[in-house]
C-alpha cells in the first residue's frame, strides 16, 4: 500500500494535505486496483478526505461525482451528455448504482429524474440492482425514493437476496415497513433457503422476525 492510499484509508488528513500540497498530481493517480484516490476515499467512508481531494482535482467523471455527491458537477455532466446516466464504469457500476451505494440521495434522485433506470443491474452476472446497494448500506431515504419510482421491490440478485433480506438482517424497521407496504414478499428465500425472517432471527432482531413470520 502506497503512502497516499494509506493516508486516505486511515483518514490522516494533516499528513494527506501535506503530501498533496507537495505533489498535487497525486490526487489524479490511481491507487490499488486502479481506483482513483477520490473513489477510494468514498469506499472507505472518509468524507473529509474526499473533500480534501476534491480541492486538488480540476475535473472528475460522472461516477466520481455520483459517489462523492458533487451535485453541481453531476448535473453539468448529464446536461452535456445525457446518455452518461446509462454508462458503466470499469467496475461495472452505473452512476445511479454508486449514488445509491454511497447514500447520495440528491444525486440519485437527479439521475432517476434524468432517465436512469432504477432496475438497471450492475454489469456482470451478479444481478445486483441499485435498491440492493441502497438497502445493504441502510440508506432508507434512497430506498424510499426508488420505491416511489416503481422499482422492482422483490428483485433478487444471484444469491437470491431481496431488499427485504437486507432490511431484516440489519434490523431496520422503517425500511422493512416501507418495503412491505410496497409489496415485498416475506416468503422469498435466498438460494440456500434463508428467508428474511431467518436473517432477522439469526441477527438478534426478534421483533422483526416475528413480523415476518
Predicted ranges, named:
Residues 1-4, 29-37, 59-64, 88-95, ...:
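Ankyrin-repeat boundary/"N-cap" motif
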Residues 13-20, 46-54, 70-78, 104-112, ...:
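Ankyrin repeat structural motif
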Residues 153-199:
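Ankyrin-repeat and related helical/solenoid repeat scaffolds used for protein-protein interactions
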Amino acid at each position: 500500500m502506497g503512502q497516499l492510499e494509506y493516508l486516505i484509508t486511515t483518514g490522516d488528513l494533516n499528513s494527506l494535505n501535506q503530501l498533496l500540497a507537495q505533489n498535487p498530481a497525486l490526487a489524479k493517480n490511481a491507487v490499488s486496483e486502479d481506483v482513483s484516490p477520490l473513489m477510494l476515499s468514498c469506499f472507505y467512508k472518509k468524507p473529509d478526505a474526499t473533500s480534501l481531494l476534491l480541492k486538488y482535482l480540476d475535473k472528475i467523471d460522472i461516477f466520481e461525482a455520483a459517489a462523492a455527491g458533487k451535485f453541481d458537477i453531476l448535473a453539468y455532466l448529464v446536461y452535456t451528455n445525457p446518455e452518461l446516466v446509462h454508462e458503466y464504469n470499469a467496475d461495472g457500476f452505473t452512476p445511479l448504482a454508486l449514488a445509491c451505494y454511497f447514500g447520495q440521495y440528491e444525486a440519485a434522485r437527479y439521475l432517476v429524474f434524468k432517465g436512469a433506470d432504477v432496475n438497471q443491474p450492475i454489469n456482470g452476472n451478479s444481478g445486483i440492482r441499485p435498491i440492493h446497494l441502497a438497502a445493504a448500506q441502510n440508506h432508507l431515504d434512497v430506498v424510499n425514493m426508488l420505491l416511489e419510482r416503481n422499482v422492482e421491490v422483490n428483485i433478487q440478485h444471484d444469491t437470491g437476496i431481496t431488499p427485504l433480506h437486507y432490511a431484516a438482517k440489519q434490523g431496520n424497521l422503517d425500511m422493512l415497513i416501507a418495503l412491505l407496504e410496497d409489496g415485498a414478499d416475506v416468503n422469498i428465500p435466498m438460494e440456500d433457503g434463508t428467508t428474511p425472517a431467518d436473517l432477522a432471527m439469526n441477527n438478534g432482531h426478534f421483533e422483526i422476525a416475528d413480523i415476518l413470520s
